[in-house]
Curated annotation (Swiss-Prot):
HAMAP family: Sey1. Residues 824-833 have a biased composition (Polar residues). GO terms for cellular component: endoplasmic reticulum membrane. Residues 686-699 have a biased composition (Acidic residues). It comes from Aspergillus clavatus (strain ATCC 1007 / CBS 513.65 / DSM 816 / NCTC 3887 / NRRL 1 / QM 1276 / 107). This is Protein sey1. Its EC number is 3.6.5.-.
């Protein structure tokens, strides 16, 4: 690729061997050709380090030849055998003798000298048409630093031959330019090169003659008001040089031409050289004030604008043209630097935009460095290229460029800070939650406030690191304090939310603890309901609890449990760095929740089945046990009805007692409204939304405290009373039946008969110590069995054992009979005699039935005992 490119460039340069045509003979400007030529000659990026020279003179006077010898150019020259126009329009070429130095190395040609060969005047091709002469002169004066006037020695003193008409035009044009831009004096150098100078007339005399002509020309032109007394020296500098005849003195011509070429270097004004006194500088011709201050890369556009105004006969306004050029070039430079800027920044913008669409904020690595480097590079490159142009336009465009760049970079910064904000909040939340879970998992305890404060410091430090690494220090939007403040504010809000959630979890744990404690304590109170008299529920020691103070005990247990829970909650909340308002809200919610727990437990214990069971147990404790807690053995002589009535009425008094939550001390409901307290002013709707209404506390619910304390309605109480009475009646009937069944039916004469017939045996037993001791042991065992009410179970066990032995004996007998011949014959005989034996069987069954009827009362007595 490199050799091919080099070959193409060589071909392009060869095509411009004779220079480039700036304006053709038809007054058309060749802008593309000029830009291309300057680029090929490496002048485009020279900035102000270039110089422009134009040559004037009559047609066919050797202007192109002079330029070719001076600057090594290859302008077309007239053939010596023909006298015709060679240069058409205006041509331009770069100095080919660049870097040439004098023999003593004291002088060196300037770099990047551009030479314009202007079409000669007074040519027969244009005849009377002097329009192009005037326009080309105006163009050359507006663009060139040095105007070379090519004149033969013998033409000095002539008007037409010395191009006095053209010079008059130059003077008039210069005044025209001055009027358009009074702030700038468009100074130029008129360099008279006197050709075919033989020295007969001294050069100083020729200078005097030409300067007199210049003064007369200046005086003859019409001047605007205020410039009537101006001098030609106010606008032009003059230098003169004589060259030998090219044909007759070729060697001297070449030598002098080389010597003259070294005059085309940069120089400084010498105050001692005053043209008014006939002293002309022989130093470098390129003074700083001659330069038109048009950068090389904008020359083509500037020249085109100048020529457009000239060719359209518009007043030439160089400041306006310079501003237009500056605007055009600044826009071009801005586009170029923005392309490079886009290459660096667009990928970050796309990544950020994609992350925003996906809802996954991402902190882009390397964004800050890319922003700073791309911004600095773009602004510096723009400054290097555009600062050469009109200052006002440049500054305006620079601000425009900075605004354009900063708008995009600021958007990137905002996106980066937003990403850091969102990701930081998420990471903060996850870190706090993880630390809390870790503390809960290890069971070592944790300080929530310390965790939150530590994570807040980490989050803020990370956010500031991202912000500092992203901001561009030299910009007006480098301050991110507002964003940091918003971030810290949201961190505080999230911290508060996490603290409230943690306090909610703490409250839930405390509520579960309250629920567990109340469940046990309240359950014990209900289980002990009426058990203080006797029975399995009676306490082993101490006084029996009063049934009237049942709700007092429940309330005291409840208050003590909740106070203990409040202390736990307050101690734990202090590690959360919670405010007093938040603690007040938490305690208020705890009291309300605890009341709900108590009420739920009471409702559970007071369900119809549970309450009916407890009432029956209470009744049975009073009915089946005496005041000492000894079980009653019912006898016919006992006042069963009286005991039953007292026990039933005593138990029935529990139903109205349990129907309403009332304290025995005050005969009124507990002060639930005062105990819970008013709703804290800092409570939010979210704090209240999960709380059920409480009668007497939440007045807007329309439920009074009396209604809140009602456990059983009247209908439920009546229904419960009826069912309890039925259950108590069943117990009473059972007791009555037991007492009646225990009465003996043995006649009195039986005891006399038993004594008479068994006297001998009685005496024998009494006289024999062994028999007596055995009788004593049996009597003691019978008494103990009676006292423990074990006769019934013993008799039942004996009957069951005898029945089982009878069944087993029958089974073994049948097996024996079936296994012997005699038995099988007997079975066969019994089968054949089944008909005759049925009546006997019926008799036996009838007898057994009768015996059974006779024995049943005795069996009942045995069971009761």
């Amino acid at each position: 690729m490199a050799p091919c490119h080099s070959r193409d460039a060589s071909i392009m340069i060869d095509s411009y061997e004779h220079g480039v045509q700036v304006i053709d003979e038809n007054k058309e400007f060749k802008n593309p050709n000029i830009s291309k030529y300057l680029s090929l000659e490496n002048v485009t990026h020279a900035g102000f380090n270039y110089h422009l020279i134009s040559v004037f003179g009559s047609q066919s006077t050797g202007k192109s030849t002079l330029l070719n010898h001076l600057f090594g150019t290859h302008f077309s020259v007239m053939a010596e055998r023909e006298r015709r126009q060679t240069t058409k329009g205006i041509w331009m070429s770069k100095n080919k003798n660049g870097g040439e130095v004098s023999a003593d190395h004291s002088a060196r040609m300037a770099d990047n000298i551009l030479v314009m060969d202007v079409e000669g005047t007074d040519g027969r091709e244009r005849g009377e048409d002097q329009d192009f002469e005037r326009k080309s002169a105006l163009f050359a004066l507006a663009t060139s630093e040095v105007l070379i006037v090519n004149i033969w020695e013998h033409q000095v003193g002539l008007y037409q031959g010395a191009n006095m008409g053209l010079l008059k035009t130059v003077f008039e044009v210069n005044l025209q330019l001055f009027l358009k831009d009074k702030n700038t004096t468009h100074r130029s150098l008129l360099f008279f090169v006197i050709r075919d100078f033989v020295g007969t007339t001294p050069l100083q005399n020729l200078q005097t003659t030409l300067m007199e002509d210049m003064s007369r020309l200046w005086d003859s032109i019409s001047k605007p008001p205020g410039l009537e007394n101006s001098s030609v020296h106010d606008y032009f500098d003059f230098q003169f040089y004589g060259l030998p005849h090219k044909s007759y003195q070729p060697e001297q011509f070449v030598a002098e031409t080389k010597k003259l070429s070294l005059r085309f270097r940069e120089g400084q004004r010498d105050p001692a050289m005053d043209a008014r006194r006939g002293k002309f500088s022989e130093g470098g011709v390129f003074l700083p004030e001659y330069h038109r201050r048009i950068p090389a890369d904008g020359f083509s556009r500037y020249a085109e604008g100048i020529w457009d105004q000239i060719v359209n006969n518009k007043d030439l306004d160089l400041p306006t043209q310079q501003e237009l050029l500056a605007q055009f070039r600044c826009d071009e430079i801005m586009r170029e630097v923005m392309l490079v800027f886009d290459e660096a920044i667009t990928p970050f913008e796309e990544k950020q935009s994609q992350a925003a669409r996906l809802g996954e904020p991402e902190v882009l690595g390397g964004l800050g460095a890319a922003m700073r480097s791309s911004r600095t590079k773009a602004i510096n490159e723009f400054e290097i290229e555009a600062s050469r142009y009109h200052k006002g336009v440049y500054q305006r465009k620079q601000e425009e460029l900075e605004d354009k760049i900063d708008t995009r970079l600021k958007a990137l910064l905002q996106g980066q800070l937003n990403a850091a904000h969102k990701s930081g909040i998420n990471e903060f939340t996850e870190a706090v939650s993880a630390a809390v879970k870790m503390g809960q998992k290890h069971g070592t305890g944790y300080d929530f406030a310390e965790i939150v404060n530590g994570e807040v410091r980490k989050a803020v430090a990370k956010y500031e690191d991202v912000a500092r690494s992203t901001v561009v220090e030299s910009t007006s939007w480098r301050d991110y304090s507002q964003e940091l403040s918003l971030y810290e504010k949201e961190l505080a809000e999230v911290s508060g939310r996490l603290r409230r959630e943690e306090m909610r979890r703490l409250a839930s744990r405390v509520e579960r603890w309250v629920q567990s404690r109340l469940g046990d304590s309240v359950g014990l109170e209900f289980n002990a309901l009426g058990s203080g008299r006797a029975g399995g529920g009676a306490p082993e020691s101490g006084e029996k609890p009063s049934e009237k103070a049942f709700w007092d005990r429940i309330w005291n247990v409840f208050v003590e449990t909740v106070l203990d829970a409040e202390r736990r909650f307050t101690d734990r909340a202090s590690s959360f760095d919670a405010s007093l308002e938040e603690v007040d809200v938490g305690l208020w919610r705890l009291r309300r929740k605890s009341w709900g727990v108590l009420r739920a437990k009471v409702d559970e214990e007071m369900t119809e089945g549970n309450l009916l069971l407890k009432l029956r147990e209470n009744f049975e404790d009073k009915f089946r046990y005496d005041d000492a807690g000894v079980p009653r053995i019912w006898r016919p002589t006992d006042d069963i009805e009286g005991i039953y009535t007292r026990a039933r009425e005593s138990t029935l008094t529990l139903i109205p007692l349990l129907s309403r939550f009332r304290l025995a001390e005050t005969s009124a409901p507990p002060p639930l409204d005062r105990w819970i307290g008013h709703t804290p002013s800092s409570a939010t709707p979210a704090d209240e939304e999960d709380l059920p209404p409480i009668g007497g506390v939440d007045e807007e619910e329309g439920k009074s405290l009396e209604e809140e304390m009602t456990i059983l309605s009247e209908a439920k109480s009546q229904e419960l009373t009826v069912r309890f009475k039925k259950s108590a009646d069943g117990v009473y009937v059972e007791a009555k039946r037991s007492a009646i069944g225990g009465m003996t039916q043995v006649p009195l004469y039986f005891y006399g008969l038993l004594l008479a017939l068994g006297w001998n045996e009685i005496v024998a037993v009494l006289r024999n110590p062994a028999y007596f001791f055995l009788l004593f042991v049996c009597a003691v065992g019978a008494y103990v069995t009676y006292q423990l009410n074990l006769w019934g179970p013993i008799i039942k066990m004996t009957e069951a054992a005898s029945n089982q032995a009878l069944v087993e004996g029958k089974k073994r007998l049948r097996e024996f009979l079936e296994s012997s011949d005699t038995g099988r014959q007997a079975i066969a005989m019994s089968t054949s005699g089944a008909g005759s034996g049925r009546s006997g069987e019926q008799y036996e069954m009838s007898d057994f039935s009768q015996k059974s009827k006779t024995a049943s009362p005795a069996d009942e007595d045995t069971d009761t005992l």
